[in-house]
């Protein structure tokens, strides 16, 4: 008889190999930025009054030495822009630690999140430094629009820049995210950055410099106007960065779509914005899935009934919390992965005995009794379903993430008779694995396995499962003559961040962190 277990996706740490690399670039706090007004010879400094330097003067001073390599748009080749179309003083991007004085829980969660480490974490640092070294810092504007907005808008991304960068440690900071005014839908920085402020008065006046915590507490409505708007709760807001492309300016070839999680969500059952999905699902958004309310033990001022929207944004990034040794973040990610996200079902067997007619099709297995004999040729059909994810699985950067089906057949003594999709002793994935991956191709036809997207010329394979859809993996083996007793067949989906090639490249040593959804028959 067939026994089908309940399926689930669960994060599981299998092995942690000692790391040999340090974390990326850390910010330098308390630095002074000085701009010279060349007409008068005066020096304007903002070390004592952050944000006080006039924006127009700042923008003019930066423009004098800025490399407008991609035309008059200073933020190209990203799609980001500011409300004025020009630079924003670096000091206006306040440290997130300032917010943490009152928003204690949100700040603590953000600090361990992928957003809070979007620039400094070593995997990104390795990649963006390669781009800078191979093509120039101007090209990193494409990436930094979503990994370090303050660097982009302050004009720091030009050769010989004198802009001090205390914001590097913050990545996607509180003030950067909460200052975005609108989204354009174009991806890779498809947003308009507003003028950062701590208070916005009813008449639209923006206040930042010299504002104290007490002034904020005395005028919560103005603080709310500065920090919150309906846009922040929409999928369009998240899609401003969770949608990407390789523009012609970057690869010297042509526009290539990289990923479009926002578009995938819109086409899913969860958005209620598309007539195409077959399955009916309750309305979900990016926020309701990735920012569920959780307890606020540090008494965050924004907590309601002791809870606030999680600023951990748990998803599938196990690499950052393992690298920085943050068990709380890793636990949040693991719990998120334990939800009923994927389904995997050993749905059918095809049996062909020697000397017999056509093969026999047995399905569904949980409703059929059957037996097999030595020398039978068995083909197992495994169905993998993206049940409760509002976008593709795996999403986004499939070229250096790795998801695959692990399939094993064992005898009663536990001896492996057949396997596919396993991690070899050297840490690399079995080449026969049924995997979900994007294979990028360089100009010379070789595989672009280090995420050097600026060298991408084409996509050889892009295997994934869209929301609400299924994939079938087939495995064929022959029952050994000497086998007696039942066989055990097990299938599970494994996921690791990152591929061994990329993690070794970035760190020198790898971190094995795998998540799984599984099914088995006996």
Language model region names:
Residues 139-153:
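Long, hydrophobic/aromatic-enriched structural stretches that serve as scaffold segments
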Residues 19-32:
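Hydrophobic membrane-insertion alpha-helices, especially the h-region
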Residues 9-21:
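N-terminal Sec-pathway targeting helices
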Residues 43-90, 106-139, 155-457, 462-467, ...:
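Primarily the internal scaffold of c-type cytochrome electron-transfer domains
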């Amino acid at each position: 008889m067939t026994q089908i277990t309940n399926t689930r996706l669960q994060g599981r740490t299998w092995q942690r190999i000692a790391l040999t690399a340090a974390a990326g670039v850390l910010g330098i706090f308390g630095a002074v930025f000085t701009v010279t007004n060349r007409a008068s010879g005066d020096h304007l400094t903002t070390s004592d009054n952050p944000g006080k330097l006039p924006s127009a003067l700042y923008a003019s001073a930066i423009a004098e030495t800025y490399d407008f390599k991609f035309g008059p748009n200073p933020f190209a080749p990203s799609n980001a822009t500011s409300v004025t179309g020009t630079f924003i003083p670096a000091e206006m991007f306040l440290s997130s630690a300032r917010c943490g004085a009152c928003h204690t829980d949100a700040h603590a969660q953000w600090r361990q999140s992928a957003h809070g480490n979007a620039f400094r974490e070593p995997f990104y640092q390795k990649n963006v430094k390669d781009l800078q070294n191979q093509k120039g810092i101007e090209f990193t504007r494409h990436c930094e629009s979503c990994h370090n907005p303050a660097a982009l808008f302050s004009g720091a991304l030009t050769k010989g820049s004198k802009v001090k960068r205390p914001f590097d440690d913050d990545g996607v900071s509180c003030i950067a995210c909460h200052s975005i005014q609108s989204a354009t839908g174009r991806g890779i920085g498809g947003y308009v950055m507003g003028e950062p402020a701590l208070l916005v008065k009813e008449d639209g006046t923006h206040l930042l410099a010299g504002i104290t915590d007490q002034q904020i507490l005395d005028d919560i409505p103005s603080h709310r106007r500065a920090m919150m708007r309906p846009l922040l709760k929409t999928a369009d807001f998240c899609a401003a960065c969770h949608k990407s492309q390789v523009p012609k300016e970057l690869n010297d070839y042509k526009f290539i779509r990289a990923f479009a999680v926002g578009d995938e969500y819109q086409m899913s059952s969860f958005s209620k914005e598309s007539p195409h999905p077959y399955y009916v699902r309750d309305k979900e958004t990016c926020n309701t899935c990735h920012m569920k309310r959780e307890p606020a033990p540090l008494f965050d001022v924004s907590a309601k009934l002791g809870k606030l929207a999680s600023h951990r944004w748990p998803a599938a990034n196990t690499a950052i919390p393992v690298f920085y040794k943050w068990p709380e973040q890793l636990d949040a990610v693991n719990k998120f992965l334990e939800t009923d996200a994927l389904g995997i079902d050993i749905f059918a067997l095809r049996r062909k005995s020697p000397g017999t007619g056509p093969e026999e099709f047995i399905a569904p297995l949980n409703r059929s009794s059957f037996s097999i004999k030595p020398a039978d040729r068995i083909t197992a059909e495994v169905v993998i379903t993206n049940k409760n994810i509002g976008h593709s699985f795996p999403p986004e950067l499939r070229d250096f993430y790795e998801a695959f089906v692990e399939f094993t057949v064992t005898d009663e003594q536990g001896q492996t008779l057949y396997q596919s999709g396993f991690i070899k002793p050297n840490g690399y994935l079995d080449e026969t694995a049924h995997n979900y991956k994007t294979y990028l191709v360089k100009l010379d036809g070789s595989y672009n396995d280090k995420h050097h997207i600026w060298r991408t010329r084409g996509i050889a394979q892009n295997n994934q499962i869209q929301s609400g859809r299924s994939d079938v993996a087939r495995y064929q083996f022959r029952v050994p003559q000497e086998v007696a007793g039942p066989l055990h067949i097990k299938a599970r989906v494994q996921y690791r961040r990152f591929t061994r090639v990329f993690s070794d490249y970035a760190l020198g040593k790898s971190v094995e962190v795998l998540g799984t959804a599984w099914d088995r028959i006996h």
